[in-house]
Amino acid sequence: MRNAVDIKTLADVKEKVKHEKRTHCLVLNKYRVNELLKNKDAKIWFLNIFRFPSVLKFREYQGCLVETGPYDGEVLRFIHSYVESLGGGEVSGQVSGQVNDQLSCQMTSHANDSQAGTPLADAPLADCRLIPLNARFNRALHELMQREGKGVLEGVDMRPEEGDERDVAAEGGGVEDVAQQGAAHQDAPPALEKLLRVIKAEGIQIRTIQLQFGYDNMNTSQVLRKVFPSESEVIHKYEMIGHIAHLNFCERFENHKKVIAEIILDKNKSIRTVINKKDSLKNVHRTFTIELLAGEENYLTMLRENDIKVKLNYELMYWNSKLKKERDRIYSLVENNSIVVDVFAGVGIFSLHLSKKNCLCFSNDINLHAYNFMNVNIKLNKRRSILTYNLDARAFVCMLLRLGIFSRDTSTLAMQLGEQNWRNVSLDFVNSAGRDVVDAGKGKKRAADCKVDCKEDCKEDCKEDCKEDCKEDCKEDCKEDCKEDCKEDCEVKDCKAGDSHQSNSHQSNPHESNPHESAPRDKKKKLAHGDANGPLGERPPGVAATHGGEEVPPEPTNNEAEQKAEDAPTNETHQVDINLGIYGDVHVLMNLPQTALDFLDVFRELLHMYSAGQKDPQGRCRRDQMRNVFIHCYFFSKPELFYEHAERNIRMQLGGIPREMKITEIRKVSPSKLMYVVEFNLKDVFSQGDQLG
């Protein structure tokens, strides 16, 4: 047997994990197998090994039967006598008479079995099947026979291997109860008694068989525990990101990490890439150095979470599948028609979730690649109420403060959208309280909408969009609409359908003149990107973003989908009005545990604007004019100091502490480092915060 230190390749692993198992097996006619397999009392005693058949053909495993002399006959006679002592019936000779005769002959003259023309080589044996029994049966049988002064054959396995457990309940208790009942009572467990009665009643034979198992009969966890039996924390759990398996190896596995990765890759067909994190997340973009251990070097992946498709490049941006429970918790916490501010959004997963609850979402990330994939995922999931930004966190929050989304008095949000956010949102959707009515019409396109898309398809700059949006049954209409005699009709319909989705009305060539576009619109105004009243905060691709003032050059993207020229937004901007009267509380998500608490100081300005000690000209308290602003701020801390750590930082950054705050443990990063989230209503931060100047 090889030691773990000798394991260098997958071939070494396969050699090490080979093992044999000697056990009893039932021999019966193949026509009775299905009936026996349906017997739940008998089924719990059958051998259950990963990717190993429960029923074996006699001829294929004939060579695995063990020479035991008179032992098999003694076991069978013991079973018959035991059942008779319980009041069992006679053996049925109709069902398996041939099997009984042939195997009786075999037990008395086993030494001649290998000779040609013996009963084992006769044709009727093709009707025989073997059902191996597990170690639990061997142990229970051994306890029964010991009371008669007998024991089972030496070498028969008594210890169940991993994977040899069934959770099928027997009469009077589960599987573990069955194993204990034999020791507690003089008689056999009820489930075993029922199997023994079946053996006698059906004329089933008992034989001893030695089976060989190996790498193919073990799952990933079993293989790793077999290779590293002395390790209490063998890596058998890992984070899955689409087709990527992400492991964090400690030093003691340094020499074996590649072979462990090969095992994981080989045992899991959905995995194509296995990586190791070489350092911690210390840079602004929350990325780490990837070490490829096995598989293909492909970090562009797709995953699903709660019916949401998420596309990302794991090498260039942050993602943590372990936070799914936390995302679900936030989803259940946030009410419908809330305003969501995700300061460190990554690929936008919080907003993608919460937009399903008709929330107006503002998502920001300083990482340009994360920002680009955020927009990709919005389009992929057909979300229509998410505005995306690529800004420093403080600049992002300051932008929202100037927009006035935290004020109860702001009924209409007037803002300018760049081309990307113009594509992301639907004004009809975000300004409608009855969203279900809007969503109900998404199933099929109306004929007029198809013709509008057809006209756009004829133009060179919109071919890609039409390939995605036009259905197969509309393609013939597209060809017809491109003809000269249909152009006028398309233009008229284009004007009429302009309100159905704003992206259709701005994809045509801006240099073309259209007499039907002269009608002014109150909600939409086009401005040059360099206009003094240009969009607040929306950063065009290529402009550097910072958290601390330093310039962060964008990283190369390896020709990803986000770099496609046809998807790049133009410099055109749009004036829009959003009805904030239909939205309620504000939820600010700050999922950057390393430094998120340090960013709370950006809300000092908001506390000063709505100081509890000030009144407006009508005599109303300024603080009452502020929406409920619920902060969800994540942080790392030692488990014994988490509350003091949060309270100290909140007091330092905000100049006061809230009346109430809730701290929830999210996950264990290491024994001395846990992730928490502190949650409070910014509106309830008083005392020193009232005196901020």
Swiss-Prot record:
Stretches with biased composition (Low complexity): 500-512
InterPro entries: MeTrfase_TRM5/TYW2 (IPR030382), SAM-dependent_MTases_sf (IPR029063), TRM5-TYW2-like_MTfase (IPR056743), TRM5/TYW2-like_N (IPR056744), tRNA_Gua_MeTrfase_euk (IPR025792)
Catalytic activities: guanosine(37) in tRNA + S-adenosyl-L-methionine = N(1)-methylguanosine(37) in tRNA + S-adenosyl-L-homocysteine + H(+)
Gene Ontology annotations of biological process type: tRNA N1-guanine methylation
Location of region: Disordered: 497-572
Keywords, sorted A to Z: Cytoplasm, Methyltransferase, Mitochondrion, Nucleus, S-adenosyl-L-methionine, Transferase, tRNA processing
Binding site for S-adenosyl-L-methionine: 327, 365-366, 392-393, 591
GO MF term set: tRNA (guanine(37)-N1)-methyltransferase activity
Transport keyword on record: no
PROSITE patterns to which the protein is assigned, alphabetical: SAM_MT_TRM5_TYW2
Localization of this protein: Mitochondrion matrix; Nucleus; Cytoplasm
Entry's Gene Ontology cellular component terms: mitochondrial matrix; nucleus
Alphabetical list of PANTHER family matching this protein: TRNA (GUANINE(37)-N1)-METHYLTRANSFERASE 2, TRNA METHYLTRANSFERASE
Family: Belongs to the class I-like SAM-binding methyltransferase superfamily. TRM5/TYW2 family.
Subunit structure: Monomer.
Function, in words: Specifically methylates the N1 position of guanosine-37 in various cytoplasmic and mitochondrial tRNAs. Methylation is not dependent on the nature of the nucleoside 5' of the target nucleoside. This is the first step in the biosynthesis of wybutosine (yW), a modified base adjacent to the anticodon of tRNAs and required for accurate decoding.
Descriptive protein name: tRNA (guanine(37)-N(1))-methyltransferase
